[in-house]
Amino acid sequence: MQRGKVKWFNNEKGYGFIEVEGGSDVFVHFTAIQGEGFKSLEEGQEVSFEIVQGNRGPQAANVVKL
């Protein structure tokens, strides 16, 4: 599992990016966020996640808010 902070997340469009220290930013889609209810992330929020290969490159999967 990787750890990072949410760089930005657009609730209307349902996606954003996670900053990884010493690495490239990782795309995150709301469907990758674990938990019940409205799936959203806040800027600066710490998360853990896995990196998988998506259609357009690396993206976050199994995102858990810390």
From Swiss-Prot:
Pfam families: CSD
Domain CSD residues, every copy: 4-63
Superkingdom of this protein's organism: Bacteria
Record keywords, A-Z: Activator, Cytoplasm, DNA-binding, Stress response, Transcription, Transcription regulation
Subunit structure: Homodimer.
Role this protein plays: Affects cell viability at low temperatures.
Name under which the protein is recorded: Cold shock protein CspB
Source species: Geobacillus stearothermophilus
Organism lineage string: Bacteria, Bacillati, Bacillota, Bacilli, Bacillales
